[in-house]
Amino acid sequence: MGQERLDNANPTLFDSKPRHRPVTGTERDESVEDPIDSWEIFDLIRDINDPEHPYTLEQLNVVQEELIKVFIDEEETFVKVNFTPTIPHCSMATLIGLAIRVKLLRSLHPKVKVSVSITPGSHSTEESINRQLADKERVAAAMENQGLMHAVNECLRVPE
């Protein structure tokens, strides 16, 4: 792809977080239930490939642990992920959001509810994109579209 066709030809790169966090005593205790938390969700999505650049969403600071919230009660677990496109007019924002959502749907228990949206104020059409990402029928239809799923799977592909 030629540089003139990129939305953001020179994205800023950020350092990656350490792969391992300190292990607490309760995490070592197999008799204690270890509920999912924001770090685990971040670890699932940090290596998603950007559709436009040869970098991960973490390297581009599109996903950040601080923008992930996990709510757990007796009835359900709810995961909310905000992501921040590198530029306010990023044409790949919907694809990035869909890739995050698909990765979580494939990785988490089906009972876990997932919400993926653009960080408020970070994109010129965030309301429209957030509506699309929240619409279960549109997401299901997108997952049936072979061309779109090829693009999503490329984002989710693990480098060799």
Curated annotation (Swiss-Prot):
One of its GO terms (biological process) is chromosome segregation. Residues 1-32 are annotated as: Disordered. The lineage of its organism: Eukaryota, Metazoa, Ecdysozoa, Nematoda, Chromadorea. Belongs to the MIP18 family. This is MIP18 family protein F45G2.10. Keywords: Chromosome partition. May play a role in chromosome segregation through establishment of sister chromatid cohesion. It comes from the Eukaryota. GO terms for cellular component: cytosolic [4Fe-4S] assembly targeting complex.
